[in-house]
Amino acid sequence: FCLSRGLGDVYKRQIIYTSGSTGTPKGVEISHGNMAAECMDALQYMPRAIDIPDRRLLLFLPLSHVFARFMATVAFAGTLTLGLTSNMKTIIKDFEDFGPTLLLAVPRVFEKVYNAASQRAGTGFAGRMFARGVRVAREWSKAKQSGNGIPAGLRMRHAFYDAVVYKKIRTVFGRNADFAITGGAPMDSDLAHFYNGIGMPLLEGYGMTETSGPVCVSLPENNHIGTIGQPLCG
């Protein structure tokens, strides 16, 4: 729409400030053309996330963040249903009520969920079950990523822990979520293998305020832990 109306790179859409992690925050001018091109690239590169029916995202990044602005815009370009929340104290209930199909969060959010699950399991029998389940999830993920197949014994142990441990952790994110996109900080590989092993792949990406959003992102069908995926078109 922006490009068809001739708005393009001439007309400024917004000014978004950088985080200031490398110095004084800078105001970045982003044009209608910048954001329109970014959205079109995302629709072509990652349709499973934003351009098939019944996709839902609960956005809890602040709208002062360029990625939140990008997702709010691309929702209109695709078929993504977008929910907004700002209260982290109610986020678990919000996940349950809204039922997102994908998640978008910095690595710290997934660390907190893992730590909370570990603390809740405690140090008794439940704690030992959780610890064993964690080991099996990581082994399963690494075996799958190796491309050499998953041994039968590991598949059986994984199926057992999926029923008694992993399913409960997945429900924290709602009933429909099948993968998550994360960035903004390095993701610990052990944590990434754990989530991949329980059936919630964390797709790492990279972007900057100056690029209007994402530059690279991993895909669900081609997710190599420890990488940020392929660059978007353009």
Locate predicted features.
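Short, structured coil segments at secondary-structure junctions
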Residues: 6, 78, 98, 198-201
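Conserved AMP-binding/adenylation subdomain of ANL enzymes
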Residues: 36-166, 176
